[in-house]
């Protein structure tokens, strides 16, 4: 019998326990042996819980019990989770986690520890929640050189942007609804709306694609706080919707570019129709072409189901999974992983006339005129040209309020 310990009994941790109880027979059959939770580590009081006898507050009890084969980490963050996970791997116990911050920051180190101590470190739920993406990329797409990953990986901001489009709501109104429904944190929604959550996820996928650690701090990241109802209306005029896009590209020379940013997505693009709390990740392979992974990116039971699937994988395959699921350590690079390629852009400027905007930005057209400025569609520009245009706008007493890249239609 395989004994399991769960670290943290919040939304995901309690979901893992529920999945293991409700689907015990199927999980055990697939794992090849009975699977049972022996410990649940959490500092809170669960004396009234039906499984009260499983709760402990001493982490060392798990390390000292030779019966525990797999540890599920759902604490979140890195302050406690990282040392706990490190200790478990060093003791030869496999770890399954949904902790994107830990994987994005310490993934290479923890993968190496798993290899060194003949166990597994698995994290399917860290990117897609309940939507499989890690396993398909390192197993099913193993015959491909992956050149690009692009997608919607944060359900909260996608829900908010959907509300802003469908109901003509402002950012604050959409955020309030997301908080009331439990999609966004009430105290500090910054991880979602400022793009940090999406940044960690694309850092993990970039590390997997490139074979070495890509750090979140090297990925240019912008959230959706600056998006207004006027921008949503302008996007509609251009035949687009606004989505928070996480992306990475790998050049033929091995160069890497990555980013998280709100973008104009043409309605013909596959990502344009991904609404509400759903996520979608488009992966480009040199042999397969484009493949899209779609589903709910969060939620108690969807995320827990991915964690439990990792538990089964750890019990069946152990360290063998790291024949394909692995990346090397690397130091953070200097600067940001920007993409030098030109693209079409939407810019919103204040304090200058439309004719002046046209003279500064070049070939394109005015989308909307405002009382104190305009929005302008630039047919083609790169980062250098946009920066130079912004300097000219500011020199004339104006300001650039928003810049959105437009994705191609055929993605």
Task: Identify the role of each PLM range.
Residues 1-91:
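N-terminal glycine-/serine-/threonine-rich beta1-alpha1-beta2 phosphate-ribose binding loop
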Residues 146-150, 158-161, 165, 183-190, ...:
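Catalytic, metal-anchored helix/loop core of enzyme active sites in primary metabolism
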Residues 311-411:
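A conserved regulatory-domain signal marking ACT and ACT-like small-molecule sensing domains
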Residues 81-87, 91, 100-138:
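Rossmann-fold NAD(P)-binding glycine/threonine-rich loop
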Residues 68, 115-197, 204:
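Rossmann-like NAD(P)H-binding beta-loop-alpha module
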Residues 94-96:
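A short hydrophobic/small-residue beta-strand
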Residues 173-273, 278-280:
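Substrate-binding/catalytic subdomain of NAD(P)-dependent oxidoreductase enzymes
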Residues 7, 11, 15, 35, ...:
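Conserved active-site and cofactor/substrate-binding residues in soluble primary-metabolism enzymes
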């Amino acid at each position: 019998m395989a004994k399991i310990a769960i670290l943290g009994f919040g939304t995901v941790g309690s979901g893992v326990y529920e999945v293991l109880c409700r689907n015990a027979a199927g999980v055990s059959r697939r794992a090849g042996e009975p699977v049972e939770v022996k410990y649940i580590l959490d500092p809170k009081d669960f004396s009234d819980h039906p499984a009260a006898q499983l709760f402990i507050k001493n982490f060392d009890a798990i390390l000292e019990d030779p019966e525990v084969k797999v540890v599920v980490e759902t604490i979140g963050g890195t302050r406690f989770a990282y040392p706990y996970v490190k200790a478990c791997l060093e003791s030869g116990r496999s770890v399954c986690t949904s902790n994107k911050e830990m994987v994005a920051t310490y993934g290479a180190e923890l993968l190496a520890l798993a290899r060194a101590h003949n166990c597994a470190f698995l994290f399917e739920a860290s990117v897609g929640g309940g939507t499989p993406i890690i396993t398909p990329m390192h197993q099913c797409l193993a015959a491909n050189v992956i050149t690009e990953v692009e997608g919607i990986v944060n359900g909260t901001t996608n829900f908010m942007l959907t509300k802003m489009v469908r109901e003509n709501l402002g950012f604050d109104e959409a955020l309030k609804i997301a908080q009331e429904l439990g999609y966004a944190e009430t105290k500090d929604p910054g991880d979602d709306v400022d793009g940090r959550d999406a940044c960690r996820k694309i850092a993990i996928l970039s590390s997997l694609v490139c074979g070495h650690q890509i750090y979140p701090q090297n990925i240019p990241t912008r959230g959706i706080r600056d998006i207004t109802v006027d921008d949503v209306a302008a996007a509609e005029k251009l035949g687009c919707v606004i989505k928070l896009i996480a992306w990475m590209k790998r050049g033929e020379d091995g160069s890497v570019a990555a980013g998280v940013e709100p973008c104009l997505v043409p309605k013909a693009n596959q990502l344009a129709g991904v609404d509400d709390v759903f996520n979608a990740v488009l992966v480009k392979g040199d042999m397969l072409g484009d493949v899209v992974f779609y589903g709910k990116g969060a939620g108690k039971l969807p995320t827990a189901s991915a964690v439990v699937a990792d538990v089964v994988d750890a019990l069946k395959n152990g360290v063998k999974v790291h024949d394909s699921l692995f990346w090397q350590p690397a130091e953070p690079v200097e600067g940001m992983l920007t993409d030098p390629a030109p693209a079409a852009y939407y810019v919103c400027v204040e304090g200058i006339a439309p004719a002046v905007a046209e003279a500064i930005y070049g070939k394109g057209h005015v989308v909307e005129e405002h009382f104190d400025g305009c929005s302008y569609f630039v047919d083609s520009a790169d980062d250098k040209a946009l920066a130079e245009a912004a300097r000219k706008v500011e020199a004339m007493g104006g300001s650039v309020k928003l810049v959105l890249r437009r994705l191609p239609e055929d993605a």
